[in-house]
């Protein structure tokens, strides 16, 4: 039987128990430009590579969004879907603050986002969201980093990456994450940048124009660093050869600009 008999909507299972529409949405995330999240005992850091503009006079697509004073997110995949989910979470945070006069707890935000994803794959007539989120925030229980995917699954991480060539970034994080709880904020930012650089051929592409850095933590509301603040970390940024993970054998040799789905054309 041909696969296209089972991929016309999200409510049709294949004979092998697969939902092809959800798998296609996951591929949109995997082909988006990379994003990395890492946390220590007091802070969470997000770094994201913004898509190269299609023309010299066009701007970069934003990849990191502030959702509330205590939470924000980075995206990989279809930017329009990410913006819609950002508006949805902002509304949920405002409603919670109106009802309870306090910040929306991070586990509840992650659960609400997962349910939003799941509703789009449970009924015919809707398509899955083609975007993955890294949700970073700080509440009364400490720092949190969640990863959501088009299937509706929500994962709680100490550090992770998503997007194109993210396996190389995860390999770097796996080698260093045990030192994250006790490292300072500046060191944590550098680790996140090195992981992002590992997903971009050793960091040659990282600069203040195409790289976003965001932080949130104890006594620090969620903020996206300005170009001047980010310059401290990105000017002269270099990856040591020993920090560059070997590329997976099966990874295709296409460039980020060729495969990224972040720009709407």
Swiss-Prot record:
Subcellular location as annotated: Cytoplasm; Nucleus
Keyword Cytoplasm attached: yes
CDD domains referenced in this protein's UniProt entry, alphabetically: proteasome_alpha_type_1
Skewed-composition ranges (Basic and acidic residues): 256-265
Role, per record: The proteasome is a multicatalytic proteinase complex which is characterized by its ability to cleave peptides with Arg, Phe, Tyr, Leu, and Glu adjacent to the leaving group at neutral or slightly basic pH. The proteasome has an ATP-dependent proteolytic activity.
Cytoplasm found in the keyword field: yes
One GO biological process term: ubiquitin-dependent protein catabolic process
Stretches the record annotates as Disordered: 237-265
CC terms in the record's Gene Ontology section: cytoplasm; nucleus; proteasome core complex, alpha-subunit complex
Homology family: Belongs to the peptidase T1A family.
Species the sequence originates in: Trypanosoma cruzi
Lineage: Eukaryota, Discoba, Euglenozoa, Kinetoplastea, Metakinetoplastina
Subunit organization: The 26S proteasome consists of a 20S proteasome core and two 19S regulatory subunits. The 20S proteasome core is composed of 28 subunits that are arranged in four stacked rings, resulting in a barrel-shaped structure. The two end rings are each formed by seven alpha subunits, and the two central rings are each formed by seven beta subunits. The catalytic chamber with the active sites is on the inside of the barrel.
Name of the protein described by the UniProt record: Proteasome subunit alpha type-1
């Amino acid at each position: 039987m041909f696969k296209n008999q089972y991929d016309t909507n999200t409510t049709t299972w294949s004979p092998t128990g697969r939902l092809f529409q959800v798998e296609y949405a996951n591929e949109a995330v995997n082909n988006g430009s990379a994003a990395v999240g890492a946390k220590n005992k007091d802070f969470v850091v997000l770094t994201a590579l913004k898509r190269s503009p299609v023309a010299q006079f066009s701007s970069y697509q934003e990849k990191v969004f502030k959702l509330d004073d205590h939470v924000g997110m980075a995206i990989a995949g279809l930017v329009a879907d990410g913006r819609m989910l950002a508006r949805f979470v902002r509304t949920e945070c405002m409603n919670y603050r109106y009802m309870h006069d306090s910040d929306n707890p991070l586990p509840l935000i992650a659960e609400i986002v997962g349910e939003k994803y799941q509703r789009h794959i449970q009924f015919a007539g809707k398509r899955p969201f083609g975007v993955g989120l890294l949700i970073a925030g700080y509440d009364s229980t400490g720092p949190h980093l969640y990863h959501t995917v088009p299937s509706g699954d929500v994962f709680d991480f100490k550090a992770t990456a998503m997007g194109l060539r993210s396996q190389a970034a995860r390999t770097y994080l796996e080698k260093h994450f045990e030192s994250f709880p006790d490292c300072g904020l500046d060191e944590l930012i550098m680790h996140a940048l090195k992981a992002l650089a590992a997903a971009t051929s050793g960091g040659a592409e990282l600069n203040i124009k195409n790289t976003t850095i965001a932080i949130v933590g104890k006594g620090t509301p969620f903020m996206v660093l300005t170009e001047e603040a980010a310059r401290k970390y990105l000017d002269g940024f270099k990856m040591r050869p020993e920090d560059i993970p070997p590329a997976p054998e099966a990874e295709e040799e296409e460039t980020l600009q060729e495969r990224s789905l972040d720009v709407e054309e």
